[in-house]
Amino acid sequence: MSNTVRSLVIKTNVVKRIIKDVELAHIDINEAEKRVQSKIDNGEDSAEIEHQKFVLKKHLEALPDALVRLRNATNDLESISSDSAYEGTPELEQANEYLEKAKEVIEKEQTNFPTNGYH
């Protein structure tokens, strides 16, 4: 694999990983919200409830960070994938596939921006 193709593969894998990070951030947020509510419903110690709220806050802070990283990685991949050296390669096909997925994730998050409370 040439260095240029290797670079495309690396940047594609970065985008792929960050998409997973965004998905995991949503899962972590949902689970943390459930834990907080469960602690409240069970009348547990206020210190434990506050700790779980702190954990939830950290998960909420992770999502915008992942989205910024995804936007940056998407821009990097987009700029490198326009190189004519990659035309017709399976690596470019995969890069384009993940670019599309990344743009969908970013668009979905922007659409939810006013109501999701994460920004």
UniProtKB/Swiss-Prot annotation:
One of its GO terms (molecular function) is tubulin binding. Coiled coil: none annotated. Keywords: Chaperone, Cytoplasm, Cytoskeleton, Microtubule. SUPFAM superfamilies: Tubulin chaperone cofactor A (SSF46988). GO terms for cellular component: cytosol; microtubule; microtubule cytoskeleton; nucleus. It is found in: Cytoplasm, Cytoskeleton. InterPro entries: TBCA, TBCA_sf. The keyword Magnesium does not apply. Pfam families: TBCA (PF02970). Gene3D superfamilies: 1.20.58.90. The keyword Nucleus does not apply. GO terms for biological process: post-chaperonin tubulin folding pathway; protein folding; tubulin complex assembly. Supercomplex made of cofactors A to E. Cofactors A and D function by capturing and stabilizing tubulin in a quasi-native conformation. Cofactor E binds to the cofactor D-tubulin complex; interaction with cofactor C then causes the release of tubulin polypeptides that are committed to the native state. Required for the maintenance of microtubule structures and cell polarity. Beta-tubulin-folding protein; may have a regulatory role in the tubulin-folding pathway. Belongs to the TBCA family. This is Tubulin-specific chaperone A. It comes from Schizosaccharomyces pombe (strain 972 / ATCC 24843) (Fission yeast). The gene is alp31.
